[in-house]
Amino acid sequence: MRTQSIDTSPEFERIQIARIRTFSAEKMFKSVRSWTQSITSANLHSAYGSSDNMQERDLAASFVAREYGDYLARIFFTAIEKRPEWRLQPPDIQEALLPILDVAKYLNVPALLIGSVAGSIYGFPRSAQDVDILADFHTEHVTSLLEHLAHSYIFDPHVLTLALQHHTSFSLLHVSRLIKIDIIPHSTVFENALLERRQIQPLIEGREPLLVASAEDMTLLNLIQYQRQGNNADDRWNDILGILKVQAHILDLAYLDRQAQRVNVEGLLSQALIDAGIHNEDGSLSQMPASIR
């Protein structure tokens, strides 16, 4: 088994995995929320720690430019200039996520959580730079989206409208939390199938459970992205291994194998199963310790 870090022994990692398996989905989400808030807050202030006189608006705009690019930063700065009441708030993914979930519910559009947030619920929790949601909004939703999102998010209305017309993704930036939400439409047969195997997870106390892609589908989505990144994104590979290790005892390996062939990542899946200690080098099922099975 390849460990998540070269400094961690397989024995200690097995203890970690056994402990993570005792955590509820809500606790895992809280961990991702806490990690994200701590690391994003540090990144927000790190480059400007000595600039005590920097205005909060300039600090926020500089952070947005550094993390998300100049285009979104310009839209952001223009928008907050029109909001004298604007104040920077802690970068909380839960608070950044709730408004779009409420709008999706209002429009009766299923919103499926994917990306690093969903992956961390099944594997080793880590911080998330943004939140990815699979949601099939259409042109008939434009007016409602523009009306209901404008208070909570920064976005280009023209870009959003074009995205719905052409069935492409679009981004929202929470106005005070500075967390980016990427909305991704169902554009492939595989993405359409994700909803069929969705998991209903109680992630937020006092809220209805959220729809989350299954552990198997999160593995496949990460493998597809890893392949697109040239098979050399170590962080994403660690995410893949984390899901496989933590979920090894309940994974549907037959489904994983079938779907991996359909999306052309069967070779990567084979290597991931070996690195995660689930398969031997010859492809046979590994005799994993009880703490891993």
Predicted features and spans:
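N-terminus-biased detector of the onset of the functional/mature region
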Residues: 1-85
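Compositionally biased terminal segments of proteins
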Residues: 2-5, 22, 68-293
